[in-house]
C-alpha cells in the first residue's frame, strides 16, 4: 500500500507578488528528484480554520501478487483504457492500487511569514520518477518524445478526478482547497489571487472574434517569441485583452496631451505678452528710422512679402488643426462610436453659434478689447485677420502719406474728437464706479477746477511787468529763428539735392545729356518753386497758429531767469508795502473768498466723515444691541442656574433632615419601649396597649410610680427623723443598688438600639451614591473617551510615528466610482490606502477595503514595545445604512516579527471580533511566554461576518509598555 502511494503537491498561487521564500527543496529546483528514497519538502500552505479532514478511498480488486504489481508500477489506478499501451504493459495491466487521500490541518512554524496551516496530499512525484526510470529500463527502444508523452498520459490517467481532488489557485469552490473561506452557509469567498479569474472569458472571446487577424501588427505581437517570453504566465486571451485596453486608452492620452499643451500655450502667450510689447516699443524707433532710409519700392515689396508669409504660416497652422480634428473624429468606424461622433460634431457646430450670439450681445468697447486680446493670444483666423488688417492699414497710411499733400485738421474737428474722447472716458468711469463714488469724484474735480480757474483769473488780472514782456518776446524770437533755420537750405544742401535729382532721372531713363531748358520750362519751374514757397509759408503760418501757448507759457514760467526776476520784484514790492498799513476792501474780499472755498472743502470732507461716522455708529449700535442681548441671556442663564442650584440644595437639606428625623424618631421610640419594658409599664396596662400610649400617659404613670427628688428628700428627712440611723443606711444602700442596675440596663439597651440603627443607616447610605461621586465617575469615563476611547497608548498610530510596511499579496478593493471625469471619461478613482487603518478618523466609508482572504497588514510601531494587547474598531450598526456590519473582520491573528520577512514569527493570539458587541473591542495577548519587545507586528484577517466581496478595516491599535531605559 505504501509503495503505491503517491503525492501531488498543491500548486503554488500563480503570479503572486508576495515576498514568500521557497523551500530548500521543491519540484522546480530539486537536484535529487530522480534518486530513490528522496522525499520533497512540502511547502507549508495556509488553511482556513474550518477545513475538515476528508478521506477518500478507491479500492479495486486484483488477483496479482505484489511482485507483479511492482513490475507494472508504471500503470497506476485508472479506470480508463488506451490503445497506445505496449503489449508488455497490456499483459501486466491487472494491478491493484489503493489511494488514500487525506488533508491534515496542522498549525506549525513555517519557513515564511505565511500561516502555519499545512495541506498534505499523500501522493508524491517520487513514484512517477521511479516509474519513469523503470519504464526507461523496460522500454529501451522507445524514443524520448514518446516516453514524455506516455508519462504525461500516465499522470493524467492516474490522477482520476483531479478537478475534485487537487486544490485550485483560481476562483474555486472545492472543499479541498486550502484557500477556501466560507463566510456564511452557502457563501464562499474568492481567494486572494493576484490574477483575475476566468469570469470575463466570454468577453475576451467576443473581442477576438471582432479583430481582424490579417493585420500585420496584430499577428506579429500575437505570435512574437520574444514578446511571449516576457509574459510567460499570460495566455493568448490575456494578451488580446491587454492589446485591446492599450488600443482603447490611446485616445485618452491624446486628449490629456491636448489639454496640457493648450494650457501651457496660453500661459506662455500671457506671460510673454509684456515682453513682446516691451520689445515692440524698443524696436519701434529703430524700424521707423530704417523705414525712412529705405526706398518706396522696397517698402512696398517688404510689406507684401511679410503679409504673404504671415498668411501662409497661419493658413498652414489652420489646415493642420483641421486635419488633426478630422483625424480625431474619424479615427474609428465602429457602430458604437457613431452616436458619440454625432454628439461631438453637434458640439463643434454649436460652439461657433454660441460665440456669435455672445459677440452680438457685447458692446462696442468690449468687442474692441476682446479683439485686441484675441489678436495677442490666439494663432487662429481671427489673429490672421487682425494682423493683416493692421499691416494693410499701416501700408495704406504710408502710401497715402507719400502720395498726398499733407493736410491740416481744422480746430473744429479736433475739438469734436476731443469731446467724443472725453464722453467715452466719462461713460467708462460711470460704468466702473458707483453713483455715489462718481458724484464724490465730480465734486472734488469741480472744486479743484474752480480753484484753478480763480487762480488763473487772478494771475491774468495782474499786469505783466515790462521786463516779463521783454523776456517773452526774446524767447519767441529765439524759437522762430530756430524754425526758420530749419527751413532754410544751404548751398551744400542745394548741390546735394541737384545731384540726387540727376541720379533719379538717370535711373528712370528720362535724363538726356544734351537737353536744354526752354523759356517755357524755366517759367514752369519758377511757378512750381513759387507755389512750393507759398505752400511752405502758409504751412509755417499755420504751424505758428497751432503753437500751444499754454505749453510755451509753462516753459517761460519755468525759466530760472524769470523766477529770479519775479522774486526780485516781489521783494521790492514787499519792501514798499511794509511802511503802509492800509488794508483795502479788495484784500478782505480775496481772503473771504479763500476762506469760503476752504469752508466748502471742509464741508465736503466733513460730509464724507459724517457718512462714515454714521455707518460706524450704526455698527456700534448693532454691536451694543447684540451685547445687551448676550448679557440678558447670560443673566437669564445665571438665574436659571442659581434657581436650579438652590433647589438642589433645598432638596438635599430636606432629604438630610428627613433622614435625621426618621433616625432620631425611631431611636426615641425604641428608648421609650425599653423604658416601658424595664419599668414594668407594659404589665400594668390592660391589653398590652403601651405602644399606643403617648408621652403624657407615660409621664403620668412615671409620676405615679416614682417620687420626685425634692419630695423624696423631704419624706426621707421626716422618715429619718422618725427612724433610726440603721433604717436610713439600709434605704440608701437599696436606692444606690437599684439606680445602678437601672442605669446599666438602660445603657445596654440604648447601645444595642443605636448600633442596629447605625448598621441600617450605613446599609441604606451604601445603596445611595452621592452626587459628587456620580460626577467623578462621569468625569473619569469622559477622560477615558477623550484619550482615544481607550485610555491606552497606541504605538501603531501614524501621526505618532507608526507606519505601514507591507500588505503582502492583499488586493485592495476599488469601487470604480470616478471622482473626476471629463465628458463621462473617468480620469481618477479615489481609493483609501492601508494608512487609514492607523489613522484616528473613524467614519462610515473611511476604511481600508480589501478583497479575498487572508488579508495581511504589516505594521511598524514607533518604538520597541512589550506588547500587551490590541484594539480593533469598526463602525457601530447604528451608523450602517443597512443596519448590518457584514464587512467587519471576524477571525484574525496577530504576529510579532523581528523583520519584515521574518521566517519564524511569534503568535500573540487568535481572536474573534463580535459583530453583536461594542464597536471598539480590546484583545489581550494570549501568549504569555513572550518576554521580549517587538517593533514589527503583522495582522492577518482570516474571515469576515458574511460579506462576499470585500472586508473593511477601520482602526487597529497596538498597546503595550516601552522597555525601561
Swiss-Prot record:
Expressed in all cells in the eye disk. It holds the Pfam family Sad1_UNC. Gene3D superfamilies: Galactose-binding domain-like. The keyword Lipoprotein does not apply. Component of the LINC (LInker of Nucleoskeleton and Cytoskeleton) complex involved in the connection between the nuclear lamina and the cytoskeleton. Is required to nuclear migration in eye and to anchor klar in the nuclear membrane. It is a multi-pass membrane protein. One of its GO terms (cellular component) is nuclear periphery. This is Klaroid protein. Disruption phenotype: Homozygous mutant flies live to adulthood and are fertile and exhibit rough and irregular eyes. Flies have an aberrant R-cell rhabdomeres morphology and R-cell and cone cell nuclei are mispositioned. RNAi-mediated knockdown produces mild defects in nuclear positioning within fat body cells. The keyword Membrane applies. Residues 1-20 are annotated as: Disordered. Core component of the LINC complex which is composed of inner nuclear membrane SUN domain-containing proteins coupled to outer nuclear membrane KASH domain-containing nesprins. It comes from the Eukaryota. Residues 801-963 form the SUN domain. Residues 585-612 form a coiled coil. The chain crosses the membrane at residues 303-323, 343-363. The gene is koi. One of its GO terms (molecular function) is protein-membrane adaptor activity. Keywords: Coiled coil, Cytoplasm, Cytoskeleton, Membrane, Transmembrane, Transmembrane helix. InterPro entries: SUN1-5 (IPR045119), SUN_dom (IPR012919). GO terms for biological process: double-strand break repair via homologous recombination; nuclear migration; nucleus localization. Its main location: membrane. The lineage of its organism: Eukaryota, Metazoa, Ecdysozoa, Arthropoda, Hexapoda. It is found in: Membrane; Cytoplasm, Cytoskeleton, Microtubule organizing center; Cytoplasm, Perinuclear region.
Amino acid at each position: 500500500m505504501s509503495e503505491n502511494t503517491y503525492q501531488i503537491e498543491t500548486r503554488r498561487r500563480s503570479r503572486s507578488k508576495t515576498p514568500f521564500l521557497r523551500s530548500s527543496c521543491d519540484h522546480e529546483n530539486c537536484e535529487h528528484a530522480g534518486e530513490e528514497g528522496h522525499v520533497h519538502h512540502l511547502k507549508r500552505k495556509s488553511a482556513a480554520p474550518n477545513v475538515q479532514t476528508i478521506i477518500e478511498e478507491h479500492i479495486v480488486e486484483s488477483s496479482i501478487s505484489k511482485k507483479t504489481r511492482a513490475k507494472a508500477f508504471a500503470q497506476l489506478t485508472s479506470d480508463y483504457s488506451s490503445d497506445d499501451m505496449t503489449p508488455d504493459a497490456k499483459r501486466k495491466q491487472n494491478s491493484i492500487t489503493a489511494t488514500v487521500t487525506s488533508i491534515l490541518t496542522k498549525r506549525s512554524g513555517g519557513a515564511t511569514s505565511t500561516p502555519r496551516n499545512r495541506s498534505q496530499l499523500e501522493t508524491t512525484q517520487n513514484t512517477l520518477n521511479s516509474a519513469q526510470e523503470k519504464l526507461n529500463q523496460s522500454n529501451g527502444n522507445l524514443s524520448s518524445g514518446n516516453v514524455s508523452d506516455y508519462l504525461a498520459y500516465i499522470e493524467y490517467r492516474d490522477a482520476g478526478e483531479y478537478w475534485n481532488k487537487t486544490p485550485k489557485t483560481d476562483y474555486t469552490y472545492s472543499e479541498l482547497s486550502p484557500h477556501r473561506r466560507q463566510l456564511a452557509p452557502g457563501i464562499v469567498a474568492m481567494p486572494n489571487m493576484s490574477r483575475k479569474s476566468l469570469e470575463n472569458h466570454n468577453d475576451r472571446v467576443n473581442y477576438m472574434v471582432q479583430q481582424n487577424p490579417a493585420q500585420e501588427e496584430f499577428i506579429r505581437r500575437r505570435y512574437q517569441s520574444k514578446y511571449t517570453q516576457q509574459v510567460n504566465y499570460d495566455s493568448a486571451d490575456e494578451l488580446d485583452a491587454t492589446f485591446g485596453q492599450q488600443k482603447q486608452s490611446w485616445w485618452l492620452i491624446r486628449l490629456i496631451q491636448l489639454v496640457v499643451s493648450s494650457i501651457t500655450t496660453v500661459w506662455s502667450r500671457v506671460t510673454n505678452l509684456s515682453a513682446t510689447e516691451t520689445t515692440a516699443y524698443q524696436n519701434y524707433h529703430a524700424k521707423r528710422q530704417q523705414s525712412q532710409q529705405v526706398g518706396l519700392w522696397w517698402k512696398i515689396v517688404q510689406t507684401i512679402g511679410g503679409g504673404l508669409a504671415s498668411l501662409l504660416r497661419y493658413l498652414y497652422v489652420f489646415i493642420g488643426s483641421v486635419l488633426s480634428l478630422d483625424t480625431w473624429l474619424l479615427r474609428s468606424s465602429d457602430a458604437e462610436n457613431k452616436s458619440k461622433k454625432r454628439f461631438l460634431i453637434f458640439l463643434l457646430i454649436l460652439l461657433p453659434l454660441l460665440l456669435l450670439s455672445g459677440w452680438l450681445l457685447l458692446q462696442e468697447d468690449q468687442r474692441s478689447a476682446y479683439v485686441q486680446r484675441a489678436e495677442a493670444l490666439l494663432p487662429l483666423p481671427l489673429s490672421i485677420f487682425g494682423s493683416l488688417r493692421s499691416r494693410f492699414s499701416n501700408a495704406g497710411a504710408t502710401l497715402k502719406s507719400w502720395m498726398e499733400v499733407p493736410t491740416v485738421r481744422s480746430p473744429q474737428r479736433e475739438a469734436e474728437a476731443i469731446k467724443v474722447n472725453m464722453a467715452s472716458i466719462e461713460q467708462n468711469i460711470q460704468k466702473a464706479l458707483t453713483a455715489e463714488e462718481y458724484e464724490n469724484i465730480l465734486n472734488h474735480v469741480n472744486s479743484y477746477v474752480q480753484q484753478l480757474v480763480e487762480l488763473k483769473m487772478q494771475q491774468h488780472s495782474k499786469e505783466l511787468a515790462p521786463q516779463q514782456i521783454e523776456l517773452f518776446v526774446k524767447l519767441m524770437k529765439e524759437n522762430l529763428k530756430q524754425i526758420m533755420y530749419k527751413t532754410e537750405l544751404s548751398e551744400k544742401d542745394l548741390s546735394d539735392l541737384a545731384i540726387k535729382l540727376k541720379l533719379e532721372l538717370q535711373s528712370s531713363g528720362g535724363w538726356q545729356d544734351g537737353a536744354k531748358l526752354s523759356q517755357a520750362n524755366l517759367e514752369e519751374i519758377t511757378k512750381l518753386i513759387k507755389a512750393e514757397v507759398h505752400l511752405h509759408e502758409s504751412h509755417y503760418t499755420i504751424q505758428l497758429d497751432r503753437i500751444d501757448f499754454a505749453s510755451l507759457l509753462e516753459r517761460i514760467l519755468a525759466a530760472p531767469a524769470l523766477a529770479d526776476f519775479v522774486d526780485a520784484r516781489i521783494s521790492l514790492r514787499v519792501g514798499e508795502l511794509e511802511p503802509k498799513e492800509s488794508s483795502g476792501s479788495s484784500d478782505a474780499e480775496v481772503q473771504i473768498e479763500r476762506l469760503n472755498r476752504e469752508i466748502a472743502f471742509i464741508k465736503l470732507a466733513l460730509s464724507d466723515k459724517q457718512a462714515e461716522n454714521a455707518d460706524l455708529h450704526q455698527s456700534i449700535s448693532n454691536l451694543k444691541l447684540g451685547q445687551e442681548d448676550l448679557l440678558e441671556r447670560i443673566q437669564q442663564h445665571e438665574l436659571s442656574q442659581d434657581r436650579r442650584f438652590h433647589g438642589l440644595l433645598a432638596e438635599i437639606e430636606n432629604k438630610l433632615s428627613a433622614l435625621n428625623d426618621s433616625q432620631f424618631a425611631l431611636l426615641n421610640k425604641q428608648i421609650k419601649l425599653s423604658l416601658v419594658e424595664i419599668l414594668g409599664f407594659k404589665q400594668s396596662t390592660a391589653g398590652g396597649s403601651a405602644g399606643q400610649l403617648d408621652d403624657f400617659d407615660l409621664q403620668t404613670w412615671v409620676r405615679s410610680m416614682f417620687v420626685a427628688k425634692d419630695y423624696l428628700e423631704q419624706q426621707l428627712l421626716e422618715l429619718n427623723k422618725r427612724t433610726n440611723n440603721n433604717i436610713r443606711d439600709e434605704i440608701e444602700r437599696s436606692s444606690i443598688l437599684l439606680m445602678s442596675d437601672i442605669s446599666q440596663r438602660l445603657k445596654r439597651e440604648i447601645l444595642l438600639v443605636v448600633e442596629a440603627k447605625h448598621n441600617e443607616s450605613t446599609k441604606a447610605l451604601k445603596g445611595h451614591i452621592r452626587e459628587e461621586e456620580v460626577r467623578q465617575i462621569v468625569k473619569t469615563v469622559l477622560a477615558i473617551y477623550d484619550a482615544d476611547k481607550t485610555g491606552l497608548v497606541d504605538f501603531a498610530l501614524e501621526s505618532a510615528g507608526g507606519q505601514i510596511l507591507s500588505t503582502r499579496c492583499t488586493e485592495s478593493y476599488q469601487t470604480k466610482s470616478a471622482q473626476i471625469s471629463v465628458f463621462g471619461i473617468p480620469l481618477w478613482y479615489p481609493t483609501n490606502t492601508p494608512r487609514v487603518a492607523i489613522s484616528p478618523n473613524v467614519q462610515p466609508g473611511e476604511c481600508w477595503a480589501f478583497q479575498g482572504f487572508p488579508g495581511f497588514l504589516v505594521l511598524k510601531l514607533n518604538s520597541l514595545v512589550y506588547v500587551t494587547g490590541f484594539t480593533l474598531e469598526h463602525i457601530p450598526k447604528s451608523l450602517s445604512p443597512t443596519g448590518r456590519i457584514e464587512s467587519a473582520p471576524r477571525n484574525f491573528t496577530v504576529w510579532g516579527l523581528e523583520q519584515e520577512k521574518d521566517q519564524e514569527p511569534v503568535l500573540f493570539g487568535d481572536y474573534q471580533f463580535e459583530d453583536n458587541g461594542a464597536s471598539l473591542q480590546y484583545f489581550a495577548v494570549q501568549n504569555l511566554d513572550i518576554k521580549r519587545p517587538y517593533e514589527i507586528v503583522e495582522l492577518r484577517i482570516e474571515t469576515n461576518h458574511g460579506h462576499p466581496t470585500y472586508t473593511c478595516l477601520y482602526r487597529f491599535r497596538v498597546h503595550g509598555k516601552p522597555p525601561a531605559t
